[in-house]
Design a protein with these regions (language model features):
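Cell wall/extracellular polymer interaction/catalysis modules
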Residues: 2-6, 11, 33-187, 193-198
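C-terminal helix/juxtamembrane-tail motif
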Residues: 197-206
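Long, intrinsically disordered low-complexity tandem-repeat segments
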Residues: 10-28, 32
Length: 206
């Protein structure tokens, strides 16, 4: 699978100009969460899915998800570890890498439709990242803050440090896009720290 480095136009759309972490996050882009974004490719085949991590704080990692090299939505993960730093269970993001993406794994947590009614249309099935080193059950799902993820990738629209909004409509749009991909062709996702980004140090004693 080809990994696309964001172009200058796409970086502007995703606000990857990389100011100091936690400051001057992208203004709300109201087109991001419409049913048919102008940035969404009309093709059914997905050649690449990439999460570029662009903003790092001591609490969270903000990024941008690209499909076939085009900006699709913002992402939020737990804070990212500097290379060699130990994992803090439930508090740190997954390692950079390329992972098989499955759409056939039902999450027990999100199968509780009383508390997660947005998951009912998908029968509790979330995009599942396979074989992530040191992590189990890594999903792409709905949420707003670092408290909503223990290592998973949240999707939405970034409007403030450590916070995303419009997560439910963004997730719906993502699922509809992924489901259009031919089932017999494997899906993969690449998670990368943007080369211009800077990691915030993590206090190992916390």
């Amino acid at each position: 699978m080809t990994t696309h480095t964001p172009t200058s136009n796409n970086l502007q759309a995703a606000n990857a100009n990389l100011p100091a972490a936690g400051n001057n996050l992208p203004a709300a882009d109201h087109n991001v969460d419409t049913a048919q974004s102008s940035n969404e490719t009309p093709d059914t085949d997905i050649a690449s899915i990439t999460v570029w991590r662009t903003h790092f704080s001591t609490n969270a990692t903000l990024g941008a998800l690209y499909i076939n090299g085009k900006f699709f939505c913002h992402t939020l993960e737990p804070r990212t570890r500097p290379k060699g730093a130990p994992k803090i269970p439930g508090k740190t993001a997954i390692p950079e890498g390329k992972y098989r993406l499955s759409l056939n794994v039902a999450s027990p947590r999100f199968s509780d439709y009383k508390h997660h009614p947005w998951a009912r249309p998908w029968s509790g099935k979330m995009p599942f990242l396979c074989n992530v080193p040191g992590f189990n059950g890594v999903l792409i799902h709905v949420g707003n803050t670092p408290n909503d993820t223990a290592g998973c990738i949240l999707v939405g629209q970034a409007t403030a440090p450590d916070f995303i909004v419009n997560s439910i409509p963004t997730f719906r749009r993502l699922m509809l896009r992924l489901q259009r991909h031919p089932r017999h062709i494997p899906l993969y996702i690449c998670v990368r720290n943007h080369p211009k980004s800077r990691l915030c140090p993590i206090g190992l004693g916390e």
